[in-house]
Structures are given as structure tokens and as C-alpha cells.
Amino acid sequence: MSKGTLFDKVWDLHTVGTLPSGLTQLFIGLHLVHEVTSPQAFAMLRERGLKVLFPERTVATVDHIVPTENQARPFVDRLAEEMIQALEQNCQENNITFYNIGSGNQGIVHVIAPELGLTQPGMTIACGDSHTSSHGAFGAIAFGIGTSQVRDVLASQTLSLSKLKVRKIEVNGALNPGVYAKDVILHIIRTLGVKGGVGYAYEYAGTTFEQMNMEERMTVCNMAIEGGARCGYVNPDQVTYDYLQGRDFAPQGADWEKAVTWWESIKSDADAEYDDVIVFNAADIPPTVTWGITPGQGIGVNQLIPQPEELLEEDRFVAEEAYRYMDLYPGQPIKGTKIDVCFIGSCTNGRLTDLQEAAKIAKGRRVAAGVKAFVVPGSERVKKAAEAEGLDKIFEAAGFEWREPGCSMCLAMNPDKLEGRQISASSSNRNFKGRQGSASGRTLLMSPAMVATAAIQGEVADVRELL
């Protein structure tokens, strides 16, 4: 059993009690809401005559279904328009803060909460979205939940949960040029498997994470769920505090000093006990690309697609399925795979530093003929900041489309979709069958800089050759 970890401390501080089932009733400090998983939850509250218990701890935005080109209302997609109208109504009726399109603060929920300073160390955070683990980058314990649990949090501000074990994942050393936070998490998932973290919270530690900025840490924590972990986190430090200070909802003045003192106290103790510890060397991590239909099917850009006998027996069936679906074969280089669509964005990699790294590759170059490439900022604030630096002009000059904020091609809930057997280079987080809108479309996950490289070369290529 873990002891003295940040997870233990935050869990214990937010425990309301133990239910007859043995589950812990956990208080949720911040509930983030969007248009897809909330309508049914609000409807269930209405049926029971209930109101949102703590509207001041609830914040909403619209992200999944919003078009990234024509955002004029009403939306062309009738269902999307109905969903945003429902969220507008539900927030108004329950006095919930709602950041709508054009507010200056709209964007992907896991991008706007940190940039507003809503996400803070030591919090418990829930959202009806798988990638809520992103907020763990701040030393928060953040869970993705389903619609019925969204209802529970709206009504009671609590969740019924089993306490997780804690695995410490240590990565030490400096990353090589051309290797980014996305490569780190893809490498971890590749090594431990998509089910390796089931029953665990992941604590990311080591000198590599200490050297990362907050947006890089968010990328890693975002994909903890893809490795099976319910949540992932990094202990807060000066990097965290420098990011938060002065943001809209961050403590101010004397309250700031008190907050930092408390945040320091909830960090994992030096002698904390973990259920498991796994250590990686940053120098061993290459620019990584997924070749299959799970985020765990990744290889270095210069490596070959694995032979079945190289895999664990339990992974071979999915590998055989992936070979067929992706139309790739064992022993084939992933480098040189032709690309049709390049997507830079998502809650994994749609922040300012992600766009900056991709722009370094795009600057002075051109998107290859026949490739559709587009960049979708993660929020209105990210878009404004990027345009202030001229990143939009760099991308457009290179032949990329510059879009409005939203989840975009990460998932098939808006107009940005693959067609037929198209294959994409994507900075998003999931490469499941049909994930990007076509039942036969294919997705290769990689860092934003690697996506930009693929766009320029028209195929999977090594970003280090363009640095």
C-alpha cells in the first residue's frame, strides 16, 4: 500500500466517508462540464427535482461538437446546435459559469481550466471526459467520469470510488533533440501496455519531468488513461507556481503565499512508499509513432513494425488485427508511410508551446502536394497568443489551414473527419478504429513537430532531419 504520496494526501483530505459498499465517498473540488456528457445528467437532475449543489465549483465550455471553420450560429449540424443550446440552458438555469464561443475563454475543457488558473495543486477534479487526467500535471487528482457520475457530482459534489494503488514512473536525464513530451508518454505506454496501469494512479517523477514546462507535463498526464491508469500526476514545484501566479482564478496577495505553503505540504514525501516503481532513461526515448489501433502500438520513427513473435502473447491478437486494418505488415518501416491528412491540435497537443514547436518545422517550408494539413488551437486564448507571435502566418505561408478552437479531428463529433481509407498524422491521443470519423480511416499518433514534418514530407519522417 502506498504511503505519504501526493495521491494519498489529497485522497484522504477529500474523503467524506466510507460507504456500506466499501467505496470511498470523495468530495470533488472542481467539476468541469461540456456539451456531450452533460445533457442526460442535467435531465436526470430535473426528473428528480434536484439542483446543482455547488454551481460555484462547476465550470462549463463547449468543445467536442464545435466546427473549427464556420462557427456562425445556428450551426449547420442541427444536432450540434441542439447540444450547445442545451448546455446554454442548463448553465443558465443552474447559475453555472459557461465559457461560450466568442467569450475569449472558450476552448477544449482541459486547455481552458489550466490557463484560467482553475486547475490547482491538491484539488480533486472530475469531468465527463476520458482525458481529465491532464490536470494531474498540477499535482491535482483528476478523474474522467461517465454521464451517471456527472449526475452524481452535479447533485452531491461527490463520487463513489475505490482507492487506487500508486505507481511511480521515473524518467531521468535530458531528452534528445527532436524528442518531446508526446514521445515520452507514447514510449511509456508502449513499454507498460494499454492495460498496464489498471488499478493505479501514476506519479510521474524524475529529472526529465522536472525539466518539462507545464504544457509538456499536461501532455504526459493527458495520456495516463491510455496506459490504463485512472489518473496521472506530477508533484507541484516552482514551475507549477510560476505558471499559475497571476492567472484569473489563482490566489492573490497573501492568499498566494498561503496557497504555495499548502501546495508544498501535499507533495509526496521523500520517504513515500509506492506500490510499484518503474524507471526509464530519457536518452532511450526516440521520436515515436504509433503504427496500429491502440496507443500502445508505437515504435521509434526509424524502427520496423514488430513481428508477432516479438510481442507478448496477449498482444498478438490485437497486433494481427492492426496489421489488417492499417494495411501494414510486420518488418515494414513506419518511416516513409504516405500521409493524407495532418492534424495539429487536441487536449493533448493544442497548447501554445505545441504550436511553437510545430511552427519551427513549418517555417520556410511547404506542405507536400496532396496533403491536407491544419492547425487547431486548443482555446481562444491559445489562438490569440499564437497570432500575436505570428504563428498563424507561418503555418498559412507553409500551406496549413489555421482554424478556430475546438476538439476537431481528435474525434468524430464535428465536421473535421477523415474520408474513406485516408491515413492521418495526428497529435491527438487515440488511434482507435474509426476514431477520426471514417469507419476505415487510419491514424498515426505523434508529436506536433512530427506531424508538421509529415506534412512537409508527405510521409512519416524523422523530425530530426528538419531541425
From Swiss-Prot:
PROSITE patterns per the UniProt record, alphabetical: ACONITASE_1, ACONITASE_2
EC number: 4.2.1.33
Catalytic activity: (2R,3S)-3-isopropylmalate = (2S)-2-isopropylmalate
Species lineage: Bacteria, Bacillati, Cyanobacteriota, Cyanophyceae, Nostocales
Sequence positions that bind [4Fe-4S] cluster: C347, C407, C410
Note describing how the cofactor binds: Binds 1 [4Fe-4S] cluster per subunit.
Pathway annotation: Amino-acid biosynthesis; L-leucine biosynthesis; L-leucine from 3-methyl-2-oxobutanoate: step 2/4
Description of how the protein assembles with itself and partners: Heterodimer of LeuC and LeuD.
Gene3D superfamilies linked to this entry: Aconitase, domain 3
The species this protein was found in: Nostoc sp. (strain PCC 7120 / SAG 25.82 / UTEX 2576)
Tree of life domain: Bacteria
GO molecular function: 3-isopropylmalate dehydratase activity; 4 iron, 4 sulfur cluster binding; metal ion binding
Cofactor(s) annotated in UniProt: [4Fe-4S] cluster
Keywords carried by this UniProt record: 4Fe-4S, Amino-acid biosynthesis, Branched-chain amino acid biosynthesis, Iron, Iron-sulfur, Leucine biosynthesis, Lyase, Metal-binding
UniProt protein name: 3-isopropylmalate dehydratase large subunit
